Amino acid sequence: MSVWDDILTPTDREVIRRGGYGKPRGLGERPALLLIDPQYNYAGADKPILDQIQEWPSGVGESAWRAVERLKSLIQAFREKKRPVLYTRQVQKNIAFDGFAAKAVRSSSQYLEGSKGTSIVEDIAPREGDLVIDKSYASAFYGTPLLSILIKLKVDTLIVAGGTTGGCVRATCVDAVSRNFDVAVVEDCVFDRISASHKVALLDLWMKYCDVISSYAALDYVTRL
């Protein structure tokens, strides 16, 4: 059962069946793990979302921290196989000219370089050999050297986790597929503030763009390389 099953109407299910949506794309042999914005601004505190929203207005709360916990073994598996582990951070150098999220009221200082909010959560912090790419917009490809790095590393597949599902994760996955990478989103390692956004984004990615797999399937894939 997929996380989006409870939002589908009978007509939706028939459209998917008759239209042939959601067929597996498959994964290649040279993957990288791409962790989208696993930083304090978006993870927030390990509490129910409403209990931490005043301190972390963009934070997802406890569901993000459950994803972080599951990510530990996946990150370790990639490192053991000597496959690339890449992180992105949403970070602004100058809030007046940098950044895109103008539709939410936020404290600009949380998004400036040097604030705790821009730091990757300590539980899954990068190690020597991992790469961290700073970005200012939703897609990890926009205005960053990510594509050049992936080409240099001869990566053919991206295993994507992080947040938020309906924002930066979705934008990055669509751009990755548009650049001819095989892509899988790890369903239980992505997170969003809004349950509906999370489910609809995963449904849309699964239907039209990339594979959506569990952390167990992702672990099995990388350990078999």
Regions from the language model: what does each represent?
Residues W65-P84:
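A short, N-terminal amphipathic alpha-helix
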Residues G44-Q52, F100-A102:
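Short, flexible, mixed-charge acidic loops at enzyme active sites
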Residues P38, Q90, D188:
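Active-site loop/turn elements of alpha/beta-hydrolase fold enzymes
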Residues Y87-Q90, I95:
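Catalytic-core segment of enzymes that process non-peptidic bonds
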Residues M1-A32, Q76-K81, K93, K103-L225:
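Active-site-adjacent betaalpha module
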Residues E55-E69, S107-S115:
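A short acidic, glycine-rich active-site loop
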Residues P31-D46:
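Acidic-leg catalytic submotif of subtilisin-like serine proteases
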